[in-house]
From Swiss-Prot:
Residues noted as binding substrate in the record, renumbered to the chain: M94, Y123, H162, S184, R185, G186, N225, A226, M227, R228, E264, Y291
GO molecular function, one term: 4 iron, 4 sulfur cluster binding
Chain residues that bind [4Fe-4S] cluster: C408, C411, C415
Record's protein name: Phosphomethylpyrimidine synthase 2
The species this protein was found in: Methanosphaera stadtmanae (strain ATCC 43021 / DSM 3091 / JCM 11832 / MCB-3)
Pfam family, one: ThiC_Rad_SAM
Role: Catalyzes the synthesis of the hydroxymethylpyrimidine phosphate (HMP-P) moiety of thiamine from aminoimidazole ribotide (AIR) in a radical S-adenosyl-L-methionine (SAM)-dependent reaction.
This enzyme's EC code(s): 4.1.99.17
Length: 434
């Protein structure tokens, strides 16, 4: 039975208890939100994971993608990237390999982590079609479903499945046109197949069969956003909104089956459109958890897109997005390496946390408040303890140690806090009344 069906029947599962403890919320609240579809807990019943809650009134979660490419196929590096992502604080992983032995890579990653792991099954179907017949346009619709089931059996916890691309969506995309085109890899595979074969999307037509599979293994559907813009000038266009309408309808059908859903959102979007997109998605999809990809809020900062994404992530979390896919410095340039992954997770976590603070400083800002007290008392040990990455903070100060232990080399004895502690705080509260 799925987490959602258990919740609908009034049962609090161990996964719900874990999420409640992590979020410091009542387990019954988590159950009610899972039953409504407002919170998802990706937790495949084929393997053990540490449960992570994604959705309303929870801390904004961060996903890190890993995976090989056709140019760089190094399983050891991908395992290192997964480990580094976890150490940096990623809440989930997505395994998106397109090069090498895809089954072995996926299964090895799953064996080496307790984090929830996501995938995009159409990648494997397309790769196999290309290897066999030379092009993704030769994909067999039966293979699309077979790969979904195979990956579900392996233990994948959430899947990005491109069910919402249909002929009407493509018609609107074609009529309107775009500066940046269509940049979803899975969306490009499905769209090219539809155009070449002059047929409806098999994943849309056979959505009930998709639901049969994911319900059996309690896989959370991450409803893929194939029509997301790849350039700021294309954001929030008719094709994207048309797909969102379809996504909302598919969410309804999934909930009727007790299948958990997350809805993916834009990747490239101006800051001023973020709130609008979140409001529309929450309305259309009846408060399903929203998974934003980045987002990228300016298109001209390659090599620093992790910073761009952190800015977007802060705005997304602030306005109610629930799940953010990280972006690394290698975005738009190359397959990310281990250090790129670390920088991407760090940047996105900072952005997501900043957005959470705008929603509820007291609840999400315990360490921020404690840090203020530690800084005022010049207690460096406590400052490290409340830092998001304590070792990094300590390493910088230790590299350039101050003469006075209670200061740093930025100000030394001219430290404003030290001066205030010595003089202003000792003054009588009524000293400045006259």
């Amino acid at each position: 039975m799925t987490q959602m069906l258990e919740a609908m029947r009034g049962n609090i599962t161990e996964a719900m208890k874990t999420v409640a403890a992590d979020e410091k919320l009542d387990p019954e609240y988590i159950r009610k939100m899972v039953a409504k579809g407002y919170i998802a807990i990706p937790d495949n019943n084929q393997r053990e994971t540490v449960a992570v809650g994604i959705g309303e009134n929870l801390r904004t979660k961060v996903n890190a993608t890993i995976g090989t490419s056709t140019d760089i196929n190094d399983l050891d590096m991908e395992l290192e990237k997964a480990k580094i992502a976890e150490e940096a604080g990623a809440d989930t992983l997505m395994e998106l390999s397109i090069g090498g032995d895809l089954d072995n890579i996926r299964r090895t990653v799953l064996k080496n982590t307790k984090k929830p792991v996501g995938s995009v099954p159409i990648y494997q179907t397309a790769v196999e079609a290309i290897e066999k017949d030379g092009s993704a346009i030769n994909m067999d619709p039966d293979d699309m479903l077979k790969n979904i089931e195979k990956q579900a059996k392996d233990g994948i916890d959430f899947m990005a499945i491109h069910c919402s691309v249909n002929r009407e969506t493509l018609k609107r995309l074609k009529r309107q046109g775009r500066n940046g085109g269509l940049v979803s890899r899975g969306g490009s595979f499905i769209s090219s197949w539809m155009v070449h074969n002059d047929c409806e999307n098999p994943l849309y037509e056979n959505y009930d069969q998709v639901l049969d599979i994911v319900e059996e293994y309690d896989v959370c559907l991450s409803m893929a956003n194939a029509m997301r813009a790849g350039a700021l000038t294309d954001s929030t266009d008719r094709a994207q909104i048309q797909e969102l309408i379809v996504l909302g309808e598919l969410v309804d059908r999934a909930r009727e089956r007790g299948v958990q859903t997350i809805v993916e959102g834009p990747g490239h979007i101006p800051i001023n459109e973020i709130e609008t997109n979140i409001n529309i998605q929450k309305k259309m999809c009846k408060n399903a958890p929203f998974y934003m990809l980045g987002p990228i809020v300016t298109d001209i900062a390659p090599a620093y897109d992790h910073i761009v994404s952190a800015i977007g992530a802060a705005q997304c979390a602030r306005y109610g997005a629930n799940f953010i896919c990280y972006v690394t410095p290698a975005e738009h340039l190359a397959l990310p390496g281990p250090e790129d992954v670390r920088e991407g997770v760090i940047a996105t976590r900072i952005g997501a946390h900043a957005g959470d603070l705008a929603i509820d400083l007291e609840r999400f800002g315990e360490d921020d408040i404690a840090m203020a007290h530690a800084r005022k008392s010049l207690n460096w040990t406590e400052q490290y303890e409340h830092a998001m990455w304590p070792a990094d903070a300590k390493a910088i100060r230790d590299k350039r140690p101050p003469e006075a232990d209670d200061t740093c080399t930025m100000c030394g004895n001219y430290c404003a806090i030290k001066i205030v502690n010595q003089w202003l705080d000792k003054a009588d509260k009524d000293a400045f009344d006259n």
